[in-house]
Design a protein with these regions (language model features):
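N-terminal signal peptide c-region/cleavage motif recognized by signal peptidases
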Residues: 13-17
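Structural alpha/beta surface segment adjacent to cysteine/selenocysteine redox centers
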Residues: 97, 101, 108-116, 120-182, ...
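A structural preference for short, hydrophobic beta-strand core positions in alpha/beta folds
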Residues: 38-41, 140
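N-terminal "domain-start" segment that seeds a small globular fold
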Residues: 76-99
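Short, non-transmembrane alpha-helical segments in secretory-pathway proteins
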Residues: 19-35
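Thiol/selenol-based redox catalytic cores and closely related redox-interacting motifs
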Residues: 37-38, 47-51, 55-58, 62-74, ...
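Extracytoplasmic
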Residues: 34, 45-47, 54, 96, ...
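Sec-dependent signal peptide recognition
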Residues: 2-9
Length: 236
């Protein structure tokens, strides 16, 4: 009984310390005007990871020091963006909302944050058959560069709510219109995750390990890059 009571007391005390640390962080976030945030453990001692709609922050447990931007693990053969690696859970949670163009013989999977008003996004989509033929599966999420509540966001909402999302996306990228539609898909979730991953323009490509590759790359160049990246990260 005594051992059980002591263990309970220790756990309660530890929980109190954690809450106190989070309270200091929450106080700092409130001072900065950040209302919506998710506090998680950080990969280094004495800090917490804070996910916000404006990006990812690392804050010391006492709430006195802040670092903004990605954190890298350089202990291996190649640097690893541990911030984006951590965000893979959130990325995969949106998998059911992605517009997917699957390669018949899949070798690589990339997630592309796209905008229907982006010229290079159109160019990438026009070459979809070439990406797929090279074994590259493309998964789309929406990232309206003009922000939420823009005309582009409303049109992309209609695409993502269409009965046949792939056809609706193809039509819009070909210059056709799409009928207005509404559903449970929230483009704001796509946009917020893009910001957290470091997306600032489109197209932006996220690899399977969370690595962000900004900008357009032709199919063959993308395939070569993905092959090389796979070798580096696998240590082969």
């Amino acid at each position: 009984m005594k051992k059980g009571f002591m263990l309970f007391t220790l756990l309660a005390a530890f929980s109190g310390f954690v809450q106190a640390d989070d309270a200091a962080i929450q106080q700092t976030l409130a001072k900065m005007g950040i209302k919506s945030s998710d506090i998680q453990p950080a990969p280094v001692a004495g800090m917490k990871t804070v996910l916000t709609n404006s990006g990812v922050l690392y804050i010391t447990d006492d709430g006195k020091h802040i670092i903004q931007g990605p954190m890298y693990d350089v202990s291996g053969t190649a640097p690893v963006n541990v911030t984006n690696n951590m965000l893979l859970k959130q990325l995969n949670a949106l998998e059911k909302e992605m517009i997917v163009y699957k390669a018949p013989q899949e070798k690589h999977v990339i997630t592309v944050f796209t905008d229907i008003t982006c010229g290079y996004c159109h160019k990438l989509h026009e070459q979809m058959a070439d990406y797929n033929a090279l074994g590259i599966t493309v998964r789309y999420l929406a990232f309206p560069r003009q922000g939420l509540d823009s005309d582009a966001e409303k049109e992309m909402k209609a695409i993502w709510c269409a009965k046949d999302k792939n056809k609706a996306f193809d039509d819009v990228m070909a210059g056709k219109s799409v009928a207005p539609a509404s559903c449970d898909v929230d483009i704001a979730d796509h946009y917020a995750l893009g910001v957290q991953l470091g997306v600032s323009g489109t197209p932006a490509v996220v690899l399977s390990n969370g690595t962000l590759v900004p900008g357009y790359q032709p199919p063959k160049d993308m395939k070569e890059f993905l092959d090389e990246h796979q070798k580096m990260t696998s240590g082969k």
